[in-house]
Amino acid sequence: LDGLWPGRAVEFDSGSAASNAIELTKRHDRVSLTKQGAETGHLRINLAWRMRTSDIGGNQRESLLRHPFRALKPPEVIGHSQSMVNVDLDLGCLYELTDGSKGVVQPLGGLFGDVNSPPYVKLSGDDRFGSASGETVYVNLDHRDSIKRILVFVYIYDQTPAFDRTHASVTLYPSNGPRIEIGLDERHPQARSCAVVMIENVKGEIIVRREVKFVYGFQAELDRLYGWGLQWGRGYKTKAER
């Protein structure tokens, strides 16, 4: 795993009126937060996943014969329980500010960022589970003029490829308007990281663009893919961050 060394929006697919969600797809891959009236306040970005049906134990097959519609909604896996699934997905982001400063916000190395001062991005654990699971990122769009671009990514901490065993999704919750959903359901059995979504300031307009690019390496490979130019070294989460 990699730890940092010191040193015009198109049409989109929307869900039902009840779901109040925009789904970014390959065909309709971007939305303007500015045009949605959602370019201020805190943008919350959340990572969630559940195991694919074939990876859930018990009498799953027999149960599906009796209740076929359960296949449409597999049981969710709560938190990061290693005993249940042995999958540890983490959320992070690369940032670049308009003053030229660049960096990463991620659990590795305790690089949690700051929401009220540069980089105006902060990683927070999921409070529902009482631990620093690293599943939520906050972006302070009140400082959008200072933000050039933010690349949100997901990686597998324990290095065991597992994207093909999970239904993972990243959801953006703007301060106003519908949430924005990006599914990571493409099958890439050997991938260890995925660039999910780019948040970019384009001539004063805040654009959210679907990426969903899987790579076999970690943060350094995502850096090279998007030309961030940071220097990377081996990184670890502390016991409290796991």
Spell out what each predicted region is.
Residues 1-149, 153-242:
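Intrinsic-disorder/low-complexity signal
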